[in-house]
Amino acid sequence: MAFIAALGLLMAGICPAVLCFPDGTLGMDAAVQEDHDNGTQLDSLTLASINTDFAFSLYKELVLKNPDKNIVFSPLSISAALAVMSLGAKGNTLEEILEGLKFNLTETSEADIHQGFGHLLQRLNQPKDQVQISTGSALFIEKRQQILTEFQEKAKTLYQAEAFTADFQQPRQAKKLINDYVRKQTQGMIKELVSDLDKRTLMVLVNYIYFKAKWKVPFDPLDTFKSEFYAGKRRPVIVPMMSMEDLTTPYFRDEELSCTVVELKYTGNASALFILPDQGRMQQVEASLQPETLRKWKNSLKPRMIDELHLPKFSISTDYSLEDVLSKLGIREVFSTQADLSAITGTKDLRVSQVVHKAVLDVAETGTEAAAATGVKFVPMSAKLYPLTVYFNRPFLIMIFDTETEIAPFIAKIANPK
């Protein structure tokens, strides 16, 4: 079974300009690498905790705007995109962006924030044998527009952002140029990030992220069966349900929050945390989402033999406008006429008018010969004295983690897998 996800974030700005961002991340230079070797004040674990705080705040706002619907987004990519934008911001606009990302500016300098992102994104982009994580960014600049060299150099040095020239006076051609780039970088999963462009567009900043991995213990397609999934108060829907028996995997039963937590590991440095609230307890679990809750779940996980594990096979996509959501998190000025993005163009005539986030999440069997027979599926009969069945036949949460950095590239809520 492969787990595939791709996301795009578009920030469009108007005045004489449009800024665009899809989900993504970027790289760094030798100077940043040297700082990494000597250590940095903002280490990856601290950044992961801050990003988790931002992720859960963003998740709660998305749930309010999209009740009882599927949610898929990349908090890492959104925060990295906003961090790139902050390179061009000044004054209160800059402070709002960084504080909205949950950074305490009295404790962490702007330079440390960018270096921290650079270290993290470089580690994520390092080639891996069994898990594919590809992140990056690109600047599409109006060919008649002068962008400050310092901004371009910072974006390239800290985030390794590629730069391209585009003719936004020909919106259809410019749109094709951008969408073709994103489609290629996300392996065809994000087919149309940009749906329309204004001729007043000045610059488009595209961020993307693509993730693909195989389970350490795969599901057998022959065991998949049709099953009911209870999506809210409506009639149950029929979905393909993957099945596995006698799996030993990290497990925790949270009686306080009335939910079950199961970790399924990938073949490389990644894992997925599945949170299954009891019937009618999803809102309680969602309200409790915070870094401390996640820490409790992770620290409480213990290997447990699950006699039967049933998980839906699904492919879902989401499309969000994030201006209102980000405003709720305190990032407001950048969308107003008071926006100060003068470190991009040298003038204050630029603001962000639109933030569009697109995501695709695909969980499906591959039929490949992944490491299925490692012994973890077989246990003594005595272990079945207290049989345990975990049945994901109602709404649940997924959090994907890079186990080296503890960062969560993706968070999802599966309200209806059909």
From Swiss-Prot:
As given in the record, the signal peptide range reads 1-20
**Biological process annotations from GO:** acute-phase response; response to bacterium; response to cytokine; response to peptide hormone
Q: What induces it?
A: Expression is induced by bacterial lipopolysaccharide (LPS).
The organism sits in which domain of life?
Eukaryota
GO terms for molecular function, please? serine-type endopeptidase inhibitor activity
Q: List, alphabetically, the GO terms of the cellular component aspect.
A: extracellular region; extracellular space
Supply any other comment.
Answer: The single human alpha1-antichymotrypsin gene (SERPINA3) is represented by a cluster of 14 individual murine paralogs.
The domain section of the record reads: The reactive center loop (RCL) extends out from the body of the protein and directs binding to the target protease. The protease cleaves the serpin at the reactive site within the RCL, establishing a covalent linkage between the serpin reactive site and the protease. The resulting inactive serpin-protease complex is highly stable. Variability within the reactive center loop (RCL) sequences of Serpina3 paralogs may determine target protease specificity.
In Swiss-Prot or TrEMBL terms, this protein is called Serine protease inhibitor A3N
* Phylogenetic classification of the source organism: Eukaryota, Metazoa, Chordata, Craniata, Vertebrata
Gene name, please?
A: Serpina3n
